[in-house]
Structures are given as structure tokens and as C-alpha cells.
């Protein structure tokens, strides 16, 4: 088997030593000690990589309801369909019913069902009266639980409660589309939420919506933009691009999402192509200038689980195969400093 790495090296005569469901060693045949009596399986023509991380997923919808009690076989089937069949060994859920997602994670960690390592931001923060129109399809009971802090103190309390409950980060919706216009999170509230998260050693995601949202996110000190600026045809200003990169802000492009959303709205193909191309150019400029890309697809919100189109669009944005592999493996591992705890997957 070939064992490629994001550093562009490949073990052409690679071997993988597996005991039970754990990988004990992987590398060149000459350097890996094979235990006596091991059964050998030929895997010529295949590839083995580090387990992938999808840094933008959501455990929302009927498939995940009551995850603490739902039959394990049902949940395992959904995890395979949405995630593990595509090589995701780790996922970051960046908005869901926190307690339900934590219950799902606990069952995986107890060994009740096979699934990826789950990180979650739990309940995201929105501007006051700022739930976006594209969440209207979700149950009212869930929407009523989504925090919309109106003061700095309230935002700090929400972040503290969320992280204390077991969340692994914070997500801010900086600007949200409404039926009429946009709703914006105040700079003071955004900064306070970021500062409290950082004080507790956690990273912050932001949903920017547009270029003003990117600027506000960067000014607040967020760590990761959950999307590029879909639907925006103008380039990011050079000064904003440079500041975003100099502050170490990562971007999760979610390029496949743009076409998915426009198809739902029956937007003419020519318009869709133009808007998707604009998103691709935003990512091209960011990556070419040295910006850090994290792979993510928004599955869970998006019902098209197959990431093939995301790979194609990232390639169109100028990322090499090894850069895309890095965005799935070594880059998130570096970002979360989890080199020694990340599982591996094969394909």
C-alpha cells in the first residue's frame, strides 16, 4: 500500500500493523517491526492516510434526536452514512443541541457504537433577535434554546455555561440574514465571548456571512471562519486578507455548500456558476497568500454527504492534492494540538 503524507512524502512499500481495531504501526516495510505470527493481507494498489477530520459538521435533525436512548444500531448506521464511510475519524460539530451531541459522544466513547471522535461547540451564540431565516425549518423547541445574549455579561455567562457543560469551543454568528436585512452582533459582545473562550483555553469559530462579518470576526479575535463569504462577488480587500492571515485565522471554505443552497432555491445555472466561482476565487486568494485552510463540508445541515464536489472545488481554487490532504489531517491536528490522540483511517 502507498502511505502518503501531507509533507509530500510517500512510503511506496508501506505496511500497517493492526491488532484488533487498533493500528499499532505504519510505515515503510523495512522500518516497521512485524510481530511474529502476524497474518498478512495484501493491499496492493490501496492507500492509507491519517484519519480525516471534517471541521464543519452538525448533529441536527431527526436522525440524531434522543441520541442518549436511540438504538445504537440506528445511530451507527447514520454515522456511517454521513461521516465514517468518507474516512472521517474526527469531526467538529459547530452548532447543535449540545446535550444531545454530548450524549452521542459519550456512547461512542463507552464503546456502545463505532463512530468518530466528536468535538462540539454545543450551542452557538447569535445576535439579539438574530436567528437566521435559514434555520426556520428546525423545531421551535430547539430554536428557543439558542442563546442570543444582549449584554457582555450575558455573553460571558453563556460561554462559561456551554464550556462547563462539556463543549470544546465557541461559535459566534457575527451577522445573520433576516427576512428584512441583517442582524449584527455587537463588537463588545463578540470580543467578550472570544476573550472568555480564550481564557478557558478554547478556540472560537465565527459565521461571518459577508466581508463586513469577516472584518468584525477578525477584530473580535476569532480563530476560525466557518465559511468563506458565499454570495459575495467582490474580492476581500487586501488589508483585510493580510490581517486575517497575520492573526492566524483559519478558513473552512465549505465551497460545495454554495451550489447546494442555490440549487434548493432553483437559481438559474448561469447565476449559480458565477457565485460559486466567486467563492472559489476568495479561497484561491486566501490560500495563495498563505492562509490556513481547514476542510469542512457543513454536512448535517447539508444532506449531500459525499465530499467529492468539495475536493473538486478546492482543487479548482488552486489547492494541490497534498494541501487538501493537509487540510483534512495535519492542519487540524496542529490547530488543536492533538497529534497523539487522533485515530487513523484507511481507504
Label each residue range with its predicted role.
Residues 59-74, 129-149, 176-184, 229-235, ...:
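Acidic/histidine-rich helix-loop elements
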Residues 7-49:
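Histidine-rich, glycine-flanked metal-binding segment
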Residues 2-15, 28-31, 235, 320-326, ...:
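Acidic, glycine-enriched loop/beta-strand segments at the rims
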Residues 66-114, 146-168:
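Alpha-helical scaffold segments that flank or form the walls of functional sites
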Residues 51-57, 91-92, 118-123, 170-172, ...:
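Hydrophobic faces of well-ordered beta-strands that scaffold small-molecule active sites
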Residues 199, 273-347:
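His/Asp/Glu-enriched, well-ordered alpha-helical/loop segment
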Residues 103, 154-228, 232-251, 273-292:
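Histidine/acidic residue-rich metal-binding segments in metalloenzymes
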Amino acid at each position: 500500500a502507498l502511505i502518503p503524507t501531507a509533507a509530500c512524502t510517500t512510503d511506496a512499500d508501506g505496511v500497517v500493523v493492526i491488532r484488533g481495531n487498533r493500528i499499532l504501526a505504519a510505515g515503510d516495510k523495512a522500518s516497521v517491526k512485524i510481530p511474529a505470527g502476524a497474518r498478512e493481507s495484501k493491499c496492493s494498489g490501496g492507500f492509507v492516510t491519517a484519519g480525516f477530520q471534517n471541521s464543519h459538521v452538525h448533529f441536527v435533525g431527526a436522525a440524531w434526536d434522543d441520541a442518549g436512548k436511540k438504538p445504537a444500531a440506528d445511530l451507527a448506521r447514520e454515522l456511517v452514512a454521513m461521516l465514517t464511510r468518507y474516512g472521517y475519524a474526527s469531526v467538529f460539530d459547530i452548532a447543535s443541541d449540545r446535550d444531545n451531541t454530548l450524549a452521542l459522544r459519550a456512547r461512542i466513547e463507552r464503546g456502545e457504537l463505532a463512530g468518530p471522535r466528536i468535538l462540539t461547540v454545543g450551542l452557538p451564540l447569535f445576535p439579539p433577535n438574530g436567528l437566521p431565516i435559514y434555520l426556520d425549518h428546525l423545531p421551535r423547541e430547539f430554536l428557543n434554546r439558542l442563546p442570543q445574549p444582549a449584554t457582555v455579561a450575558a455573553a460571558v455567562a453563556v460561554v462559561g455555561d456551554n464550556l462547563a457543560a462539556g463543549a470544546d469551543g465557541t461559535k459566534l454568528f457575527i451577522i445573520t440574514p433576516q427576512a428584512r436585512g441583517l442582524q449584527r452582533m455587537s463588537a463588545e459582545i463578540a470580543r467578550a465571548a472570544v476573550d472568555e473562550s480564550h481564557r478557558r483555553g478554547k478556540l472560537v469559530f465565527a459565521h461571518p456571512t459577508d466581508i463586513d462579518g469577516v472584518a468584525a470576526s477578525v477584530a473580535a479575535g476569532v480563530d476560525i471562519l466557518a465559511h468563506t463569504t458565499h454570495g459575495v462577488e467582490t474580492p476581500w480587500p487586501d488589508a483585510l486578507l493580510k490581517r486575517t492571515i497575520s492573526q492566524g485565522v483559519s478558513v473552512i471554505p465549505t465551497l460545495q455548500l454554495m451550489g447546494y443552497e442555490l440549487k434548493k432555491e432553483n437559481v438559474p445555472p448561469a447565476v449559480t456558476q458565477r457565485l460559486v466561482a466567486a467563492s472559489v476565487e476568495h479561497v484561491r486568494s486566501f490560500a495563495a497568500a498563505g492562509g490556513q485552510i481547514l476542510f469542512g463540508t457543513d454536512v448535517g445541515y447539508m444532506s449531500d454527504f459525499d465530499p467529492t464536489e468539495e475536493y473538486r472545488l478546492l482543487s479548482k481554487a488552486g489547492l494541490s492534492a497534498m494541501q487538501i490532504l493537509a487540510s483534512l489531517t495535519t492542519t487540524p491536528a496542529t490547530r488543536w494540538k492533538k497529534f497523539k490522540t487522533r485515530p487513523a483511517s484507511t481507504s
